[in-house]
C-alpha cells in the first residue's frame, strides 16, 4: 500500500478456529515492527490492526492478539488503566449523552464514525473492545469502554 505497511501473521481466524498467537509469532512481530517504526518514523498511535481500519469487514488480528504486550515493547498504544478499576465499571450503564461522547472519543482515536447505523455502531464497538478490552466483546458501550476511549483520545491530540 502507498500509505501503510501490512504484517500478516498466520492464524485460522474467527471463522476457522481462531487460535492463540505463538510466542515466536509475537516476538517476531515485535522485532519487525520496532525495526519498521524506527526506519519509517512511525508514531505509536499509527500502529493499527485490520479491524481498526475496516471494523465493518475485519476482525483481525482479534482479541487474542496481545496489544498490551506490544505497547509495553514500544509497538502501538495501550490505555494503561488498572484492570481491577476498570472491571468495576463494566456493569455500569451509560446515558445517551455518554454514547455520543464515546463516538466522539472513537473518532479522535481514528475510527471512522460517519453515518453509523446501529449495526455498524455495534461492529465499531466490538472492534474497539477486541483491541482495548479483549476480555469482553459484546458491542455494548459501557462505562468501562467510555473510560478507556476517553483516556486513549488524550493520546491523539
Per-segment meaning from a language model:
Residues 17-19, 51-52, 87-88:
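A short, structure-level motif marking secondary-structure boundaries and short turns
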Residues 23-41, 55-157:
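Cell-envelope/ECM-targeting effectors and their regulatory/trafficking segments
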Residues 46-57:
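Acidic helix-start/capping segments at beta-turn-to-alpha-helix junctions
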Amino acid at each position: 500500500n502507498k500509505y501503510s505497511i501490512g504484517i500478516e501473521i498466520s492464524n485460522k481466524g474467527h471463522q476457522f478456529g481462531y487460535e492463540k498467537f505463538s510466542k515466536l509469532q509475537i516476538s517476531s512481530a515485535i522485532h519487525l515492527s520496532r525495526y519498521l517504526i524506527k526506519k519509517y518514523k512511525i508514531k505509536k498511535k499509527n500502529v493499527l490492526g485490520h479491524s481498526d481500519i475496516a471494523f465493518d469487514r475485519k476482525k483481525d488480528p482479534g482479541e487474542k492478539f496481545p496489544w498490551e504486550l506490544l505497547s509495553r515493547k514500544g509497538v502501538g498504544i495501550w490505555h494503561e488503566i488498572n484492570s481491577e478499576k476498570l472491571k468495576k465499571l463494566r456493569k455500569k450503564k451509560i446515558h445517551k449523552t455518554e454514547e455520543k461522547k464515546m463516538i466522539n472519543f472513537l473518532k479522535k482515536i481514528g475510527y471512522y464514525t460517519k453515518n453509523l447505523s446501529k449495526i455498524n455502531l455495534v461492529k465499531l464497538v466490538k472492534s474497539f473492545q477486541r483491541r482495548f478490552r479483549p476480555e469482553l466483546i459484546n458491542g455494548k458501550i459501557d462505562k468501562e469502554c467510555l473510560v478507556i476511549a476517553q483516556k486513549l483520545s488524550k493520546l491523539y491530540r
